[in-house]
Structures are given as structure tokens and as C-alpha cells.
Amino acid sequence: MAENITSAKATAKMVRVSARKVRLVLDAIRGKSVAEAFAILKFTPRGAASDVEKVLKSAVANAENNFDLDRASLVVSEAFANEGPTLKRFRPRAKGSASPINKRTSHITVVVTER
């Protein structure tokens, strides 16, 4: 009972960029073909685009090597970012006080499916 696997997934955890900023990039590539998604990411002027590109590249490699899927027929079926743990830091302020700084992290997941 060998099931036909038509999708592959890749996840990057603890990426030092907020999930809110990553979602803006992921919304641009969701539903697109892999070639089109790489072209969009290459010209997206956002810092998170390089992190998303790495995850997409990994998902495509997983599809090709682990499941023997054809790269030309792959589509970004799912792309989402969840919040990771927040690193809490403090910025010194006037009169001996301090203000909190939240350095947010995210978990980026990309799923590619054969069309």
C-alpha cells in the first residue's frame, strides 16, 4: 500500500525576524509556481525575503531528493509563519529606569505540492 506522495515541506525555526514581517513576504508567493516564487523573492525589497527563499529552496530540494517530484511542476501550496519565543532585552533610559525591547522570532514553514 504505497501511497503517492505529492508534497514536501521545509521549516526554519527561531528565525530572528517577526512573524508579522515574514507574513507580508509569504502572502506574495502563496499559490505561485516555484519558479515564479523565486523570481518574486529575488526582487522583494524586504529583509525576510532571503529567509523565505532559503526555506523555499529547502522545500524544493526535499521534494526532488526525498520524494522524486518534478521541480517544474511544483507549486507553493502552503506558506505560513508562526511566532517563536521572544527574546526579552532592556534599553537603559533616563533617571535609572529601563524600557523593554522584544526581539521577536518566527518559525517559517513552506509546503510545495506537485501540480
From Swiss-Prot:
Gene Ontology terms for molecular function: rRNA binding; structural constituent of ribosome
InterPro entries linked to this entry: Ribosomal_uL22, Ribosomal_uL22_bac/chlpt-type, Ribosomal_uL22_bac/org-type, Ribosomal_uL22_CS, Ribosomal_uL22_sf
PROSITE patterns for this protein: RIBOSOMAL_L22
GO cellular component: cytosolic large ribosomal subunit
Database matches in CDD domains: Ribosomal_L22
Keywords (A to Z) from UniProt: Ribonucleoprotein, Ribosomal protein, RNA-binding, rRNA-binding
Any Gene Ontology biological process: translation
Keyword rRNA-binding: yes
Statement: the UniProt record of this protein carries the keyword Zinc-finger: no
Family: Belongs to the universal ribosomal protein uL22 family.
Assembly behavior: Part of the 50S ribosomal subunit.
HAMAP family given in the database record: Ribosomal_uL22_B (MF_01331_B)
Database matches in NCBIfam families: rplV_bact (TIGR01044)
Task of the protein: This protein binds specifically to 23S rRNA; its binding is stimulated by other ribosomal proteins, e.g. L4, L17, and L20. It is important during the early stages of 50S assembly. It makes multiple contacts with different domains of the 23S rRNA in the assembled 50S subunit and ribosome.
Record-given protein name: Large ribosomal subunit protein uL22
